Each structure stands twice: as C-alpha cells, then as structure tokens.
C-alpha cells in the first residue's frame, strides 16, 4: 500500500492549461498539499489559482492554491509538474533550473504527437521520449519521473466525475518514483502503476495517441482513460 505523503508543495508549471488545471483541482480537492500554479504570466497564474481554490472550496477543501511566475513557482515546491507542451519542455526546464534544488522532483506528463487526416500519431523527440528529453536537460541532482500522460484533462477537471483510471509511472530514481506514485494515489480514483525506467517512456507516451484516436472515433468515450487488470 502506498503511504500518503506528508504535506508538500506541488508546483504545476503551465498550470493554467488544461492538464495543469485538472491535476491542480484534484489535488486541491483530495489532499492537504499546497498547490502552486506557475505561468509565464504571473497575473494569469494568480487568477487561475484563485479560481481553483474557490472551486475546491465548494467541495469542502481548505486547500491553499497560490500563483506565481514559473521560476518562482518552482522555487516554492518540492515536486514540479511540467504541464507544458512537449516542444516547450527543454526551454521551460532551463528557465526554472536555477530555482531547482537537489532532491526536487520533476514530473513530465507530456507526449509528442502529430496529427494528419488519419488521426493522431506518436512523434517522440530525438531523445526518444519527452520524459527522456526532460531528464537530459534537468540538473543532475534533480530526478525526472514520467507520469499522468494518459489522463483526459476534461475528466480530471470534472470534479463530480469519478476518475477510476490508472496512470503509468516511469523513472530511474526509486525515491522520486515512490513520491510521485504516493501523490498520484492521493487523488481519489487514480491508481499509479509502475511501468519501468525512463527507457520505456516512449511506449507509454505513445498510448496518448491511441486514446485520443479512440475518443475521437467514439462520442461516448470523450474523456476515456485506461485501467489495467
């Protein structure tokens, strides 16, 4: 059984976007962690944070949600979620690198995709996966974990909707993986499943294209997720 982690500060870099919003809302509703929203525009971050805190409070949560410019948000947190498009990952890590301390954890949920008339396809970066790219760019003392790739943002943000989905977690640092899995498990209805090291991240990121294609082909599956049994 995963232990619930002690109260932490979780930063969502790019936290005004859809996946950042969904994760922020779930953690604010279901946990007592402090949620820090990061954006290149601090005013947008503050507005989003106030909105998320208000929404969570309607579910009885006393969560603290604050908003800052990305580097300041990263400086305030121990776990930093890179909720940015894959083509911004490297520049985002470089922009916050001076705010990262040894032992902080970077979590990458992004997947490289391309779209044509047939649908979505996996398009990993030259590093092999977005998670590997993040690990290549991150400071040496800051472990990177891949998680939350295959979650539907709409389902996350719909707080009345039970999640009942799994998230695959990859990483090479055991403690960072354990911490990330514990944080994931604290979201009601979300089950983290360890899937191996960063070397297999490309396969997991590629599932995102499969899920989007299924969702776009089946109206009743707009916010589908995966469960492993």
What is each PLM-predicted segment?
Residues 2-54, 186:
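NAD(P)+-binding Rossmann beta1-loop-alpha1 motif at the extreme N-terminus of oxidoreductases
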Residues 64, 68-105, 112-117:
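Rossmann-like NAD(P)-binding element
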Residues 165-229:
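Active-site-lining helix/loop region of Rossmann-like oxidoreductase modules
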Residues 12-13, 82, 169:
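Hydrophobic Val/Ile/Leu positions in short beta-strands of Rossmann-like dinucleotide-binding domains
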Residues 119-127, 132, 158-175:
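Short beta-strand and adjoining strand-loop segment in the mid-core
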Residues 88, 111-113, 151-152, 173, ...:
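Glycine-rich beta-alpha junction loops
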Residues 55-66, 140-143, 190:
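A short helix-to-beta-strand connector/capping loop
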Residues 126-150:
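Rossmann-fold dehydrogenase core element
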């Amino acid at each position: 059984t995963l232990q619930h982690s002690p109260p932490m500060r979780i930063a969502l870099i790019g936290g005004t976007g859809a996946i950042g919003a969904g994760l922020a809302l779930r953690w604010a509703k279901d946990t007592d962690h402090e949620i820090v929203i990061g954006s290149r525009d601090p005013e947008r971050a503050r507005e989003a944070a106030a909105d998320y805190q208000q929404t969570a409070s309607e579910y009885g949560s006393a969560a603290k949600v604050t908003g800052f410019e990305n580097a300041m948000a990263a400086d305030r947190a121990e776990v930093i979620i890179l909720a940015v498009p894959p083509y911004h990952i490297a520049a985002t890590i470089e922009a916050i690198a001076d705010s990262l301390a040894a032992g902080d954890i970077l979590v990458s949920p992004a997947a490289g995709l391309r779209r044509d008339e047939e649908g979505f396809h996996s398009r990993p970066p030259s590093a092999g996966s977005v998670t590997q790219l993040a690990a290549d760019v991150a400071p040496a003392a800051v472990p990177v974990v891949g998680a939350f790739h295959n979650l539907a943002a709409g389902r996350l943000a719909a707080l009345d909707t039970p999640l009942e989905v799994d998230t695959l977690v990859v990483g090479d640092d055991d403690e960072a993986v354990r911490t990330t899995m514990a944080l994931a498990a604290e979201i009601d209805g979300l089950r983290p499943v360890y899937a191996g090291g960063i070397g297999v991240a490309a396969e997991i990121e590629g599932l995102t294209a499969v899920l989007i294609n299924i969702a776009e082909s089946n109206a009743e599956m707009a916010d589908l997720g995966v469960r492993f049994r």
